[in-house]
Regions:
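Glycine-rich phosphate/pyrophosphate-handling loop used in enzymes and phosphotransfer proteins
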Residues: 1-223, 228
């Protein structure tokens, strides 16, 4: 990234820092410094997106076609700083750059072929107001910059937020997000019978984007809405 003169002045007045190591970023670096980016514990889910540890979370539960993750997350590891920064330190640009990195990996293996659009996992309204943005939507924006896929934020909404998923086991995670999502009231699947009807999502393939996938509970609940149009 080559900075303009104005951007360089802004960078001097308000320097940018790597969310992983905390070192100051130089003008050619994005949100994550070159060194930390190099050592991110990337997954190998790209090698077989139809048969990997993430995809297997959803086998026999929903008709998922493929799944991938950019890197492994472990609490108190250096990568945990990334999630902390984008969730609690108002760093939406970190999420966007992660989306770009993810999309660049996926483009190498044609992961996005046959995908019609992106649906970021929505936050509860009060959570989004507190945070100022939805980190999953910011990741989706980064993916869209590379793939040019449209982002849909008006199809699904989160109507319930009970408790944070952090520190919960698999069963409690599943219980915590039951009935947490719904289609927007304006969405009427019964009015979208025609295959070519403008705006219809029936029969289309969507990429669901979340920032962290631990047990797949949130994604599973999101994908089992009371309509087959999202599956």
């Amino acid at each position: 990234m080559r900075l303009s003169i104005l951007a360089k002045i802004i960078d001097m007045l308000s320097p940018r820092y790597c969310p992983v190591c905390g070192n100051r970023l130089n003008g050619e670096e994005e949100s994550i410094c070159v060194s930390c980016n190099l050592f991110l514990p990337r997954t190998d889910t790209w090698k077989d997106p139809y048969n990997n540890e993430m995809a297997k979370m959803f086998w026999h539960r929903i008709p998922i076609e493929k799944a991938c993750a950019l890197f492994y997350y472990k609490g108190h590891a250096f990568t945990s700083n990334i999630l902390y920064q984008l969730k609690y330190s108002h760093r939406p640009e970190v999420a966007t750059d992660l989306g770009i990195l993810l999309a660049q990996e996926g483009m190498k293996v044609h992961f996005f072929d046959d995908i019609d659009g992106i649906i970021p996992i929505p936050l509860a309204p009060h959570r989004q107001r507190q945070r100022g943005y939805n980190q999953s939507e910011e990741i989706a924006k980064g993916i869209a910059q590379v793939t040019h896929l449209p982002i849909y934020t008006n199809i699904v909404r989160r109507n319930v937020f009970k408790e944070s998923q952090t520190q919960k086991d698999r069963w409690r995670r599943n219980e915590n997000v039951k009935e947490a999502f719904e289609l927007y009231p304006s969405y009427r699947p019964d009015q979208e019978k025609g295959k070519n009807k403008s705006g219809s999502i029936a029969g289309r393939h969507f990429l669901m984007v979340d920032d962290v996938c631990t047990t797949g509970a949130v994604s599973y609940t999101h994908l089992t809405l009371p309509t087959s149009d999202l599956v």
